[in-house]
Amino acid sequence: MKLYISPPQTLEYLKFEYRHFPFKACEYLKFQNLHQYIRWYYQLFPLMVQLVAL
């Protein structure tokens, strides 16, 4: 299950698009990292539930 779709060219496009606006590019990267963290957390969550249930 994917929470977001990010084609490989998206990041390169934004680096090109926002090269004069580093702050916006930085915001985008934080957003992507947040989504990756959420995905990681929800993949780990069922495992933690199983460990607690033991």
Curated annotation (Swiss-Prot):
Superkingdom, natural source: Eukaryota
Name of the protein this chain belongs to: Putative uncharacterized protein DDB_G0279993
